[in-house]
Amino acid sequence: MTNIIELPEVLANQIAAGEVVERPASVVKELVENAIDAKSSQITVEIEESGLKMIQVTDNGEGMSHEDLPLSLRRHATSKIKSQSDLFRIRTLGFRGEALPSVASISKITIKTATKEVTHGSLLIATGGEIETLEAISTPTGTKIKVENLFYNTPARLKYMKSLQAELAHIVDVVNRLSLAHPEVAFTLISDGRQLTQTSGTGDLRQAIAGIYGLNTTKKMLAISNADLDFEVSGYVSLPELTRANRNYMTILVNGRYIKNFLLNRAILDGYGSKLMVGRFPIVVIDIQIDPYLADVNVHPTKQEVRISKERELMALISTAISESLKEQDLIPDALENLAKSSTRHFSKPEQTQLPLQSRGLYYDPQKNDFFVKESAVSEKIPETDFYFGTVDNSVKVEKAELLPHSEEVIGPSSVKHASRPQNTFTETDHPNLDLKNRQKLSQMLTRLENEEQSVFPELDYFGQMHGTYLFAQGKDGLFIIDQHAAQERVKYEYYRDKIGEVDSSLQQLLVPYLFEFSGSDFINLQEKMALLNEVGIFLEVYGHNTFILREHPIWMKEEEIASGVYEMCDMLLLTNEVSIKTYRAELAIMMSCKRSIKANHSLDDYSARNLLLQLAQCQNPYNCPHGRPVLINFSKADMEKMFRRIQENHTSLRELGKY
């Protein structure tokens, strides 16, 4: 009796499903790719309960004949390749003949299909890979595939499913990538009766980007183009000012197929050069047309890994295309555009009685080492002086008075602000080792910050600055050199750390709400994690397609920081994914303190420099920035005398120093 047996086909398909079908999004990907290969111009994806209950993909493609329909559930049965040579010139998205049998083996599947050559269509129903019904029906040209009760016979796979919102976000991401890869196809995604994605199918990639990432994002995208004898590169890349906290927005397409490739990602970043800050990544959609002989897609059943010949030449082509496109642009932000963002629209003012105003300001008390709110009457126009750097001026500015006619709660386009992403002010030279994705380093950093003890700061007398970066001061212990960025970062960190923890009752209503726009997958993920944002005083409400509205903000957040601050917090939440409130607040304080601090090569006047040293003296730990870098160094009088050889070393002193 032999010990080796040939596995039944259904069991073999279930094993194959372990690689091909990881989650509901995998099913959507395989079915939609089949629809694209069938030359469809319209594809509709409908799901229920994030695909676990039902996934239905309808297309208007070529369809299948009555004879071919049952063969589609046979393993390694395909119409896309017929010989070994075809394997090296693949132009379709599918070719292995594994996807549909694998899906059918772990679900109940219903297929309705018809070709334009016949007067009737066909219906197939299968459960667990076993065909139960095969009959002729009347149905439009094309194919409709319904997958129900996914993983019903593989309960172990269900244990590893994330929340419904997380699985839905994966599906949205898959449809978005395929929409970008095939702008000539009109895609519609409907979840539990609600439309999440819709593209026009005009063939215009820029229009597809607008449908997925929003019009505001598309306006800041540049077209790129480059080619040689082997490759043709085209697409769109974002301006350096428009970035995200991870690589999820970098889409690389090879012959209409979305792929993952580390070296090509690096080529994209190389094209930006020093224009990108550390830890930030651009929004990119790059389409690469390549001779199929130069690309091997038969690497993994998911077909997302592709081996490319002449990869180094392709990298250089991509980098050059991006750098040349950026050179042609004026990367200096438009001052008038920024001014317009900070101003509000004007309306006719109704007659009103002059009333005394109450101004609420947040002030710092150096005696109590704490902040307090003070109200004061304002009789005339409130001065809008905003010193770049004075005493710890974190006053909450009143929204510029905008008298709106009395209206209902409904907010129209004229009474909201569209929030813009923050500009890149954080450079690699500031903190080259800061990586929010490295959870171990972050944990060590936060533990060190929590265990800091109150330090005694020396009394310093400021007398100068060098290269707009270092401050010089003297004290009884000699010469002190202070890194101005690290110093203010420490001051800002302790401020944000304290104030972020006091958000329960410190909210201020906005006269003009802000709108925040996200991609479909990020929008869904943020909805699931909204409670974490609420913990730090950010209350976002759903407002239209992939958009949130902010009606109030925490009092520790300045008016000019609202748009950038909220986006930064959302990016951090999406990046770190699972994070405790305590860690979330600490990470937020670290990041915001760095972004809000003065940078190198910025000259300070004597008043501002002395104020910085006074604030530093009030800190719990004035000697290190939140990332652990030293804030100041000290040269004692003896050190200075040794450097100028006023003190001669002897054998004993050298031996004590371990140098002899």
UniProtKB/Swiss-Prot annotation:
GO molecular function: ATP binding; ATP hydrolysis activity; ATP-dependent DNA damage sensor activity; mismatched DNA binding
Gene Ontology CC entries for this record: mismatch repair complex
UniProt keyword list: DNA damage, DNA repair
Keyword DNA damage: yes
Biological process per Gene Ontology, one example term: mismatch repair
Keyword Transmembrane helix: no
Family affiliation: Belongs to the DNA mismatch repair MutL/HexB family.
Physiological role: This protein is involved in the repair of mismatches in DNA. It is required for dam-dependent methyl-directed DNA mismatch repair. May act as a 'molecular matchmaker', a protein that promotes the formation of a stable complex between two or more DNA-binding proteins in an ATP-dependent manner without itself being part of a final effector complex.
Name this protein carries in UniProt: DNA mismatch repair protein MutL
